[in-house]
Amino acid sequence: MATINQLVRKPRVKLVDKNNVPALQECPQKRGVCTRVYTTTPKKPNSAMRKVARTRLTNKYEVTAYIGGEGHNLQEHSLVLIRGGRVKDLPGVRYHIVRGALDTAGVKDRKKGRSKYGAKRPKA
């Protein structure tokens, strides 16, 4: 335990929280334009072709965002909405594209977890 004198000379340092999504600048989502849509491979031990998009945000940041769900309609110059949330097996991918917002279509024939993929409720 530090003495009062020690604390007067050198106070305790406050821990600073690390921001995992700096490009959002404290906003819940940001709009952006796709500059490149491509696939990439995950880290070991996983194997797949993950769909990602390099996106230029309205605040001039350029980030890589993951396109979740099966199939997508994105191409260069598509308007997208970006939210936070990293992809654990893709280094450098710290953002997700919101499905069903702006130019991004929802996932077709999605029955469960529809709200996460912008899918409408199927007709009875």
Swiss-Prot record:
GO molecular function: rRNA binding; structural constituent of ribosome; tRNA binding
Keywords assigned by UniProt, alphabetized: Methylation, Ribonucleoprotein, Ribosomal protein, RNA-binding, rRNA-binding, tRNA-binding
Domain of life: Bacteria
Pfam families per record: Ribosom_S12_S23
PROSITE patterns, per the entry: RIBOSOMAL_S12
Modified residues (3-methylthioaspartic acid): 89
InterPro entries in UniProt: NA-bd_OB-fold, Ribosomal_uS12, Ribosomal_uS12_bac
Bias (Basic residues): 109-124
Chain segments carrying region Disordered: 105-124
Statement: the UniProt record of this protein carries the keyword Nucleus: no
GO process terms (BP): translation
GO cellular component, one term: small ribosomal subunit
Family, per entry: Belongs to the universal ribosomal protein uS12 family.
Database matches in NCBIfam families: rpsL_bact
Record function comment: With S4 and S5 plays an important role in translational accuracy.
Oligomeric and partner information: Part of the 30S ribosomal subunit. Contacts proteins S8 and S17. May interact with IF1 in the 30S initiation complex.
PANTHER family: 30S RIBOSOMAL PROTEIN S12 FAMILY MEMBER
Protein name (record): Small ribosomal subunit protein uS12
